[in-house]
């Protein structure tokens, strides 16, 4: 999913810059609206939803939600005034990073998968850098923008006191 890598990125930023302010923007009614506050971060919701690739007529309400999300994202970005915007490929990344980029705010994408998601592919052109987990992502993104970082991992997973043998037995 997108939530835990995003929280891991936020945690890393807070470790490096403890006084930094971080605001998440998520899709209303989705898991991030509970998980992000549980991780200690504020979140604003957008009514955005994914497109139905099989039945185009079902996308009329989705388009209306997208336009509304674009307007709300603009207000959120204007009010928060971020120095940068990071997208991890979730539905809310689209309108939020599109608006941030159009306002001259540097955008960064993080792609967790070996096959790039639709949102990240659409945002790639305006992104300043694209962090990827796998080699060979040049087939989706400009080689000059790619940074091979691997996937962000939650601190609790990397600081485990469980041995490899115990983990395999679980």
Tell me what each language-model feature is.
Residues 1, 36, 89, 114, ...:
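Residue-level signature of catalytic and energy-coupling elements of molecular machines
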Residues 61-78, 160, 164-166:
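Glycine-rich, highly charged phosphate/nucleotide-binding loops
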Residues 15-65, 70, 143, 147-154:
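Conserved nucleotide-sugar phosphate-binding/catalytic loop shared by glycosyltransferases and other
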Residues 2-14:
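Short amphipathic alpha-helix
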Residues 11, 34, 98, 120-121:
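Alpha-helical segments flanking ligand/cofactor-binding loops in enzyme cores
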